[in-house]
Amino acid sequence: MLPPLKKGWQATLDLRFHQAGGKTVLASAQHVGPLTVQRPFYPEEETCHLYLLHPPGGIVGGDELTISAHLAPGCHTLITMPGASKFYRSSGAQALVRQQLTLAPQATLEWLPQDAIFFPGANARLFTTFHLCASSRLLAWDLLCLGRPVIGETFSHGTLSNRLEVWVDNEPLLVERLHLQEGELSSIAERPWVGTLLCYPATDALLDGVRDALAPLGLYAGASLTDRLLTVRFLSDDNLICQRVMRDVWQFLRPHLTGKSPVLPRIWLT
C-alpha cells in the first residue's frame, strides 16, 4: 500500500560550486519542485552572485523546502533572493524549511537572503546550518518579520521555530533556537523584527567597528565574539532601520573578510 500523499509543495534545491578558469562557477543545480535559481551574475569577475527563486511566492502549511549548497575549495559565492519569503496562515499543517550550507577549506560564502515574513496564524519551522572549515569564511544574516507591522498587523497567533547553527571542523560554535507561540512575544521584547548577522573569522577590531554601526538600533542590539565567530543580534520595530543597519554592517565587514569592496547585488537596487 502506498503512503498517503503529502499536502503542499515538496521542493529541494542542491547547488554545487567549483573553481574553473579563475572564477567560481555553478557546476550543478539540481531541483525538484518550485525551487530554482537565476543564471549566475559576475559583477566582480571571479565572485559568483546567485539569486534563489521560489516562483509560488509564498510558503503555506504542508510545504517542505530543502536548500543545500556545497562550495569547493577557493570558491566565493554570494547568494540572495529577489524578495521576502512569506509564510502564510495555516489551518494546522506546518511549513518546514531546511537550509544547509557547506564550505570547503578557503571557501567564502555570503548568505544574504531577504527577510522572512510570518503572517498571523503561520505555523513554520526553519533550520539553517552552516558547516565550515577553520579556513572558510562566512558572512550571513537572518532577518525575521513577525506580522506586517507596516499596516499595524501583529503576530497575534501562530507558531514559529527558528534554529540557527554554525559548525567549524565538526565542532559547534553556535546553536541558537527561537520559539514563539500564540502571540507570546515577551522573549523578544514585543518587537516585530528579529535579526542575526554572522561573520567568521573575526577579530576584536571588527567587533568594535560593528558595535559602532549598531548605534541606530539603540539598546536592542548587541554583538559578541566567541571562538572567532562574530554574532550580531538585534530587535526593532522599524524595518528600514533594520535593513539599513544590516547592510551597513555587511559593507563594513566585507572588505576585512574577503579583501573586496562591497558590491550590492543588482536585485537590491530594483
UniProtKB/Swiss-Prot annotation:
It is found in: Cytoplasm. One of its GO terms (molecular function) is nickel cation binding. Signal peptide: none annotated. The keyword rRNA processing does not apply. Pfam families: UreD. The keyword Chaperone applies. Keywords: Chaperone, Cytoplasm, Nickel insertion. GO terms for cellular component: cytoplasm. PANTHER family: UREASE ACCESSORY PROTEIN D. Belongs to the UreD family. UreD, UreF and UreG form a complex that acts as a GTP-hydrolysis-dependent molecular chaperone, activating the urease apoprotein by helping to assemble the nickel containing metallocenter of UreC. The complex may form in the order UreABCD, UreABCDF, UreABCDFG. The UreE protein probably delivers the nickel in a GTPase-dependent fashion. Necessary for the functional incorporation of the urease nickel metallocenter. This is Urease accessory protein UreD.
